[in-house]
Swiss-Prot record:
<dbReference type="GO" id="GO:0006308">
    <property type="term" value="P:DNA catabolic process"/>
</dbReference>
<dbReference type="GO" id="GO:0005829">
    <property type="term" value="C:cytosol"/>
</dbReference>
<keyword id="KW-0963">Cytoplasm</keyword>
<keyword id="KW-0269">Exonuclease</keyword>
<comment type="subunit">
    <text>Heterooligomer composed of large and small subunits.</text>
</comment>
<dbReference type="InterPro" id="IPR003761">
    <property type="entry name" value="Exonuc_VII_S"/>
</dbReference>
<protein>
    <recommendedName>
        <fullName>Exodeoxyribonuclease 7 small subunit</fullName>
        <ecNumber>3.1.11.6</ecNumber>
    </recommendedName>
</protein>
<comment type="similarity">
    <text>Belongs to the XseB family.</text>
</comment>
<keyword id="KW-0378">Hydrolase</keyword>
<dbReference type="InterPro" id="IPR037004">
    <property type="entry name" value="Exonuc_VII_ssu_sf"/>
</dbReference>
<dbReference type="GO" id="GO:0008855">
    <property type="term" value="F:exodeoxyribonuclease VII activity"/>
</dbReference>
<dbReference type="GO" id="GO:0009318">
    <property type="term" value="C:exodeoxyribonuclease VII complex"/>
</dbReference>
<dbReference type="Pfam" id="PF02609">
    <property type="entry name" value="Exonuc_VII_S"/>
</dbReference>
<keyword id="KW-0540">Nuclease</keyword>
<comment type="function">
    <text>Bidirectionally degrades single-stranded DNA into large acid-insoluble oligonucleotides, which are then degraded further into small acid-soluble oligonucleotides.</text>
</comment>
């Protein structure tokens, strides 16, 4: 995969993380050429940023849900 490929917003966190892990393994292996390793590293940075964005979005959503749950009052029906 080339680093010129634009990371689409619809790539899932899990897909991005898996690709990032594969890149780390390839670089750690040390069998790639310098140019390929640099390109892989660049792609890894894009994937890392994407994962951080997805995590931030999830954290904000959880905070919003938690605040909503904390402020919701549940009224029980009473028998008359």
């Amino acid at each position: 995969m080339t680093n010129t490929k634009i990371l689409e917003d619809n790539i899932s966190f899990e897909e991005a993380l898996k690709e990032l892990e594969e890149i780390v393994k390839k670089i750690d292996n040390g069998q790639e050429s310098l140019e390929t390793a640099v390109n892989s590293f660049e792609r890894g940075i894009v994937l890392k940023n994407h994962c951080e964005k997805k995590l931030k979005e999830a954290r904000l959503k959880i905070e919003k849900i938690t605040k909503l749950a904390d402020s919701t009052v549940v009224l029980e029906e009473t028998e008359i």
